[in-house]
């Protein structure tokens, strides 16, 4: 990469320069090779980025093996020694994730209606009650 010459840029405001007296009051010089603080994004920035990322994607968000164990555990209550095709578990997972995404969309609308941005258990209960899933 070729090096380029730096040109001076006009300042666009920001903090006012500190007085020279304040720098002389310091007893020790700052460390030359100090530890650099890790970069942190402002609150909400990463959340918005994740929302956009997951809205674009179509892959399943629940891990396959834990979901498979859960399905088998629930099926044990109805009949022992049940066997599942892999396509059956994939279909169950697809349906379960679609249901959860829809429920969270409705839950978010309930929270927004209550003039909040944070979803709460009462929002999920209201969304399910409006849907007619729970009386």
UniProtKB/Swiss-Prot annotation:
Keywords: Chromosome, DNA-binding, Nucleosome core, Nucleus
Main location: nucleus
Residue segments, region Disordered: 1-40
Keyword DNA-binding on entry: yes
Compartments where found: Nucleus; Chromosome
CDD domains associated with the record: HFD_H3 (cd22911)
PROSITE patterns: HISTONE_H3_2
GO cellular component: nucleosome; nucleus
Biased composition (Low complexity): 19-31
Record-annotated disulphide pairs: none
Entry superkingdom: Eukaryota
A GO MF term: DNA binding
Subunit and interaction comment: The nucleosome is a histone octamer containing two molecules each of H2A, H2B, H3 and H4 assembled in one H3-H4 heterotetramer and two H2A-H2B heterodimers. The octamer wraps approximately 147 bp of DNA.
Family assignment from sequence similarity: Belongs to the histone H3 family.
UniProt function note: Core component of nucleosome. Nucleosomes wrap and compact DNA into chromatin, limiting DNA accessibility to the cellular machineries which require DNA as a template. Histones thereby play a central role in transcription regulation, DNA repair, DNA replication and chromosomal stability. DNA accessibility is regulated via a complex set of post-translational modifications of histones, also called histone code, and nucleosome remodeling.
Protein name (record): Histone H3
Lineage: Eukaryota, Amoebozoa, Evosea, Archamoebae, Mastigamoebida
């Amino acid at each position: 990469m070729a090096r380029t010459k730096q040109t001076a840029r006009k300042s666009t405001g920001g903090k006012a320069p500190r007085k020279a007296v304040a720098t002389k009051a310091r007893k020790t010089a700052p460390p030359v090779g100090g530890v650099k603080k890790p970069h942190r994004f402002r609150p909400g920035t990463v959340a918005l980025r994740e929302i956009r990322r997951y809205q674009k994607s179509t892959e399943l968000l629940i891990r396959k093996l834990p979901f498979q164990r859960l399905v088998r555990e629930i099926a044990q209550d109805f009949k022992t020694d049940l066997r599942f095709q892999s396509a059956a578990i994939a279909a169950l997972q697809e349906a379960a994730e679609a249901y959860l995404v829809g429920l969270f969309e409705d839950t978010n609308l309930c929270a927004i209606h209550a003039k909040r941005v944070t979803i709460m258990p009462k929002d999920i209960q209201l969304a399910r009650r409006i849907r007619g899933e729970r009386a």
